[in-house]
Amino acid sequence: MALKITQIKGTVGTKPKHRENLRSLGLKRIRHTVIRPDTPEVRGMILAVRHLIVVEEVAGE
């Protein structure tokens, strides 16, 4: 299973760690979407920035 992650809010005024997590997920701007594998590491990054993103489950790798 994979996760479709879309950034819905900007990073102005956020903590540096949150910006690092978004960059590690591959998100660069608002409405940018990436597909990442469903792993504990990715879930941890998602948990830290859940107020800035939307996550959907998709079939696939």
Curated annotation (Swiss-Prot):
Instruction: Give GO terms for biological process.
Output: translation
Any GO MF annotation of the entry: structural constituent of ribosome
Q: What domain of life?
A: Bacteria
Alphabetized InterPro entries for the sequence: Ribo_uL30_ferredoxin-like_sf, Ribosomal_uL30_bac-type, Ribosomal_uL30_ferredoxin-like
Q: What keyword terms does UniProt attach to this protein?
A: Ribonucleoprotein, Ribosomal protein
According to the UniProt record, one GO cellular component term is: cytosolic large ribosomal subunit
Q: Which Pfam families does the UniProt entry name for this protein? A: Ribosomal_L30
Subunit-structure text: Part of the 50S ribosomal subunit.
Which family does the UniProt entry place this protein in?
A: Belongs to the universal ribosomal protein uL30 family.
Q: Please name the PANTHER family in this protein's record.
A: LARGE RIBOSOMAL SUBUNIT PROTEIN UL30M, MITOCHONDRIAL RIBOSOMAL PROTEIN L30
For this entry, the protein name equals Large ribosomal subunit protein uL30
Organism from which the protein derives: Corynebacterium glutamicum (strain ATCC 13032 / DSM 20300 / JCM 1318 / BCRC 11384 / CCUG 27702 / LMG 3730 / NBRC 12168 / NCIMB 10025 / NRRL B-2784 / 534)
Lineage of source species: Bacteria, Bacillati, Actinomycetota, Actinomycetes, Mycobacteriales
Gene behind this protein? rpmD
